[in-house]
Amino acid sequence: SARRSYADLIAKPFMPDDEKYNYYFYDINAKINHKFSDRSRLYLSAYNGKDHFATQYDDNSDFKDGSKMNWGNTIISARWNYIFNNRLFSNTTVSYNNYLFNVSAYSNNQYSLTNNTTFINRYSSDYRSGINDWNYQIDFDYNPSPMHHIKFGAGYIYHRFRPEVMTSKISDKVDSEAFRDTTYHSMNNSRIYAHEVSA
């Protein structure tokens, strides 16, 4: 199954030519299962969703700017169900999750100076962060009698964080002569790893 918002498509013809706004989201779901036998069955599922927001201003003269914001999730999962007997069955699950957040902006300014020269300033920035998870889980359900129900299992999650990756660029020039062209990078752009165990 899939769906997408369409408010942006309806609003687009009514926006001014020099100013644009755009927002939409979508998500996609897919599921499939396979029966190997009366005791064994495999379930596969996948999900992808994204939100997008953008602005743009361009008056076809000396000033342009815009920004974008995107965030979304991707999840893939496989689960194997096995029945040992009428009292005991298990579920073994392997899943992957990816989340990404991104914000970017730009501007382009142009000015005419008094000495018949043109000053141009350009700026852009990009910010990203995200997380990846690998999850391994096994769960057992045991019914020794109609009056008792026992659940037990174990799990492991491998986390990989990508925090605060930031890049900014600034450039200035007069006519064709550049006197500033600088790129800044954030200091905290290394990945962080973590392990989580449960039982």
Go through each PLM region and give its residues.
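Periplasmic-side early beta-strands and strand-to-turn transitions of outer-membrane beta-barrels
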Residues: 1-71, 101, 105
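Face-selective signature of the C-terminal outer-membrane beta-barrel domain
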Residues: 33-51, 70-199
